[in-house]
A protein has these predicted regions:
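Residues immediately C-terminal
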Residues: 379
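A glycine- and charged-residue-rich anion-binding loop/surface
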Residues: 1-374, 382-384
Length: 384
């Protein structure tokens, strides 16, 4: 009934998109799965604002996480240190001390948050996931499970405390994981540039996710991308990778200078007076994330999917380096297997098309025979 009310209301107001908030209300309060809401909306020639729905869903998840934390302990100060330094742009390890810590009770388990005097661990932000790794002294090792920024301070999540909190530690980022993340992040910048170059400067970033496995990029565009456009975009990104452009990084430069350089800024994002600029060839963006030192380090780039997430917003997911190589290798293996089945024709596509044509012709003959048999059976029955 609530869905019917929403559909009628949207049509009455001459709107063609159901807000993500309303879709989330159906999901959260009435137990309506999103795909069912999308199906009913589609039947009524309506769309769903998926970006807003995802935002509502994430907010609920964050509230659930907060609710699951039954109690935060008070911050226990070990060392007075008003300024925490992030050294992760230049280093993946550092000698550190713990300045503060506190406990938190999550889903029946006690975990801990640590703050260091300085840190090589990148905190989640700008679409990039937080670093993991470990801290170690002569009494043992503690795994860093995640890194986030809270109230401007970088906080490290651990399942247990070191035996000696006052020790000096060696902090080490999971470098293999970070390298994979950096490849995907730099590829995201090249993808953004390729989209604006091929589709037009109306393209604006609307969201992103960068982790060690893949990259996801949401952007404004008015229509589904056709296979030719996707191929051009993929080629453009791979060409930029092969140009082997060295990273040009400028830190703490005035915003006005960044604007003059033509740096891309995210709509709605709040920037300070000083910003960090990341450049690979003609790709210039404001960014606080971790990147490769040269575009060639990204390896191959392969688009895995393109879809709509709301009216006027498209989403591309892609793979880099070894994961992209695996996809390409699998496709080639499939090609070889099909070619082998068809006795290695010189023109595989033509052979498949001929096979389809022959199959359709045989199907018509079979249908005709079945019809003839059926008619003959009817005649026999009538004689009887």
């Amino acid at each position: 009934k609530r869905m019917e009310e929403i559909v009628k209301s949207q049509k009455k107001q001459l709107k063609n998109t159901i807000s993500g908030q309303l879709a989330f209300e159906l999901y959260d309060r009435y137990g309506f799965p999103l795909d069912l809401t999308q199906l009913i909306a589609s039947e009524n020639k309506l769309k769903i604002d998926i970006v807003e729905f995802d935002k509502c869903l994430n907010e609920q998840k964050n509230r659930s996480k907060i609710d699951a934390v039954k109690e935060y302990g008070d911050w226990i100060v070990l060392k007075q240190d008003d300024v925490q330094e992030f050294v992760g742009y230049d280093h993946s390890n550092a000698k550190i001390i713990i300045t503060k810590y506190r406990s938190l009770f999550v889903k029946g388990k006690t975990k801990f948050q640590l703050i260091f005097n300085l840190t090589p661990f990148y905190p989640e932000g700008g679409g990039q996931v937080g670093d993991t790794g470990f801290i170690e002294d002569n009494q043992g090792m503690v795994q860093i499970k995640d890194t986030k920024k809270e109230n401007g301070v970088i906080v490290h999540y651990v399942d247990e405390l070191p035996k000696n909190l006052n020790s000096s530690f060696h902090g080490q980022v999971d470098l293999e994981r970070r390298i994979k993340i950096s490849k995907n992040h730099s590829a995201t910048h090249l993808l953004h540039h390729a989209l604006r170059d091929i589709l037009g400067t109306h393209v604006e970033q609307k969201g992103s996710l960068v982790n060690e496995n893949y990259l996801r990029f949401d952007f404004s565009h008015f229509s589904k991308l056709n296979p030719q456009e996707l191929e051009l975009i993929e080629q453009k990104v791979n060409n930029q990778i092969r140009e082997a452009n060295s990273l040009i990084e400028e830190r703490n430069i005035p915003m006005e200078i960044a604007k003059k350089k033509g740096a891309i800024m995210l709509f709605g994002e709040k920037y300070g007076d000083s910003v960090r600029v990341i450049q690979f060839g003609k790709s210039i963006e404001l960014c606080g994330g971790i990147h490769v030192s040269n575009s060639a380090n990204i390896g191959n780039f392969k688009i895995s999917s393109e879809s709509s997430i709301s009216s006027g917003i498209r989403r591309i997911e892609a793979l880099c380096d070894k994961k992209a190589d695996e996809v390409i290798s699998n496709k080639l293996n499939e090609y070889e297997a099909i070619s082998k089945l068809l006795k290695h024709p010189q023109e595989l596509l033509s052979a498949v098309e001929l096979l389809q044509s022959n199959n359709q012709s045989l199907q018509k003959k079979l249908d005709s025979c079945l019809l003839y048999t059926s008619d003959a059976a009817d005649e026999v029955d009538s004689v009887d």
